[in-house]
């Protein structure tokens, strides 16, 4: 029997169950939602179990309360297949005592018109939402955790050794991704998981998510385009233009929008929103989201790249390393009840990531694969942005950090900026 690797989301789920009657865990397929929920659940129904699926569909329409019978917390896996159950849960939570009754997991949102008609209430006040992602390096035991974001925000952060990874090893981790199944394997078997994942998306899932038939060939071409545009604020028209050289027929922007929208509904794409701070100057802030997959291995698999391919193309590696860091930062932020955004203004000043908490504390983060010149560029950007922030109306940044791929330990520059290998971070 496989040993369960503790997830950062274990504590997030427990806290949510203490606060609400039901918790919805959303996230990409294979990221570990069901397994994590099973650690806490006292009973479970697998809606898509082939032996029970037909019966579950009928029961959801005729007597949805029957599907709720069982010890609490009760896990309802792939709940979006029977959206009628949503209102049944809301009603039960309203008319019973106690929190932490239900856990719902799903790899897609029920977004077609028929499913929407089956959900009459939003769930506000009864449900808590958790967005789960593939494993961070700390969860897959590939980060020492010597630098804690919680400590940095508390003003007591200490710097320590990193779990050392060579650039070649980081290329492997980027291609392998944080899929729990992949972290239990090694070599080719581990790398294959992302390729199988992308195959499933383009051949079945992207059409199944909203019952719209989509072309597998165009699906993979759009995913390749998104992979080439990771870490950019590319518009739908820019994606269309990227497709043009390899497209036998013109692709309409509405078609691109539909395909990208389907990928978002499956949590395959998770764009990063813009951060809009109060600035001393009046430079307009860009509000376009930054394009990211939920895991860097989706990009490498879509492009047909392995670790050697990344090492032969360090520019692409740099962009996809940024996707890996974005994945980890989002999980570390979630553990601190925070979020991650990006900053870019009309003058070209940008910051790859801003981790911000609900109480107004925030940290500025640049991502660089490594090298003195790139680190110097990151220092310049961070210091310039910090100097532009109006500290009369906002707090000063709790920290400034550059995340790099390699390094034996984290250290502090003379200006106070932290240089941290990705292999030393934790929540």
Model-derived features with residue positions:
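N-terminal pre-Walker A segment at the start of P-loop NTPase domains
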Residues: 1-14
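Conserved lysine of the Walker
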Residues: 33-34
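Short glycine-rich substrate-engagement loop in P-loop NTPases that contacts/grips substrate
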Residues: 45-73
């Amino acid at each position: 029997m496989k040993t369960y690797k503790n997830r950062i989301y274990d504590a997030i789920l427990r806290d949510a169950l203490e606060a609400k009657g039901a918790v919805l865990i959303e996230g990409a397929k294979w990221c570990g939602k069901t397994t994590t929920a099973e650690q806490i659940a006292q009973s479970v129904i697998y809606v898509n179990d082939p032996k029970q699926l037909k019966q579950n569909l009928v029961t959801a329409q005729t007597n949805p309360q029957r599907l709720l019978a069982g010890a609490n917390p009760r896990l309802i896996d792939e709940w979006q297949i029977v959206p009628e159950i949503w209102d049944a849960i809301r009603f039960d939570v309203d008319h019973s005592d106690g929190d932490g009754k239900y856990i719902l997991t799903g790899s897609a949102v029920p977004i077609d018109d028929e499913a929407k008609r089956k959900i009459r209430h939003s769930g506000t006040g009864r449900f808590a939402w958790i967005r789960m992602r593939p494993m961070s390096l700390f969860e897959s035991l590939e980060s020492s955790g010597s630098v804690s974001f919680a400590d940095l925000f508390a003003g007591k952060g200490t710097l320590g050794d990193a779990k050392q990874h060579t650039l070649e090893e980081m290329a492997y981790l980027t291609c392998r991704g944080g899929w729990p199944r992949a972290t239990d394997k090694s070599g080719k078997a581990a790398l294959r998981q992302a390729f199988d994942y992308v195959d499933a998306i383009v051949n079945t899932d992207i059409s199944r998510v909203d019952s719209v038939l989509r072309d597998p060939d165009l699906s993979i071409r759009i995913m390749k385009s998104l992979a080439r545009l990771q870490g950019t604020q590319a518009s739908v028209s820019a994606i269309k233009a990227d497709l043009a050289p390899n497209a036998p027929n013109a692709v309409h922007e509405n078609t691109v929008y539909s395909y990208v929208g389907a990928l978002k509904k499956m949590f395959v794409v998770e764009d990063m929103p813009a951060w809009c701070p109060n600035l001393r100057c009046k430079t307009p802030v860009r509000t376009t989201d930054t394009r990211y997959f939920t895991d860097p291995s989706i990009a490498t698999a879509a492009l047909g790249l392995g670790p050697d391919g990344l090492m032969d193309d360090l520019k692409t590696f740099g962009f996809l390393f940024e996707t890996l860091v974005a994945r980890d930062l989002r999980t570390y932020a979630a553990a601190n009840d925070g979020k991650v955004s990006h900053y870019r203004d009309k003058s070209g000043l940008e910051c790859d990531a801003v981790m911000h908490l609900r109480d107004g504390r925030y940290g500025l983060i640049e991502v660089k694969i490594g090298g003195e010149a790139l680190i110097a560029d990151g220092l310049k950007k961070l210091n310039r942005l910090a100097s532009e922030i109006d500290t009369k109306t906002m707090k000063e940044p709790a920290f400034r950090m550059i995340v790099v791929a390699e390094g034996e330990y984290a250290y502090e520059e003379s200006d106070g900026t932290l240089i941290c290998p990705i292999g030393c971070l934790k929540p």
